[in-house]
Amino acid sequence: MYPVHLLVLLAVCVSLLGASNIPPQPLNLYQFGNMIQCANHGRRPTQHYTDYGCYCGKGGSGTPVDELDRCCKTHDDCYTEAGKKGCYPKLTLYSWKCTGKAPTCNSKTGCKRTVCDCDATAAKCFAKAPYNNKNYNIDTKKRCQ
């Protein structure tokens, strides 16, 4: 083998080792976003739910500010329970379809079904709950104690 080939091979190996330290990205959040759009018939962009109240978005604490925020807390709790069963909700891809303008899970068993049910239930809850613009991008340090 030529020295240049060895250098290229070494560079690839080092790159792969570095990539193994990159944390995995939440893959199923794209699916969840599509479920939300299915349930609310595209009336509200998915990103409006990423920084709403005390529980919609990353993390969560305190008392939910309204019905929509309670949907997010319930979804967080569902993911926690799925994690206790050995599932990785943010990384679990599942099969579903939009029927009658509501998400329906096709995955039958295990983590795929559990996570799909968490997401479908939350998406339907979001569609029913009123959206209060005052609860978007709130000061969580003050309002979520």
Curated annotation (Swiss-Prot):
InterPro entries found in the cross-reference section: PLipase_A2, PLipase_A2_Asp_AS, PLipase_A2_dom, PLipase_A2_dom_sf, PLipase_A2_His_AS
Its EC number(s): 3.1.1.4
UniProt cross-references to Pfam families, sorted A to Z: Phospholip_A2_1
Binding note for cofactor: Binds 1 Ca(2+) ion.
Sorted UniProt keywords: Calcium, Disulfide bond, Hemostasis impairing toxin, Hydrolase, Lipid degradation, Lipid metabolism, Metal-binding, Platelet aggregation inhibiting toxin, Secreted, Signal, Toxin
Residues that bind Ca(2+): Y55, G57, G59, D76
PROSITE patterns named in the record: PA2_ASP, PA2_HIS
Originating species: Austrelaps superbus (Lowland copperhead snake)
Name of the protein described by the UniProt record: Basic phospholipase A2 S11-61
A single GO molecular function term of this UniProt record: toxin activity
Protein localization: Secreted
Stated role: Snake venom phospholipase A2 (PLA2) that inhibits collagen-induced platelet aggregation. PLA2 catalyzes the calcium-dependent hydrolysis of the 2-acyl groups in 3-sn-phosphoglycerides.
Superkingdom as given in the UniProt entry: Eukaryota
Residues in the signal sequence: 1-19
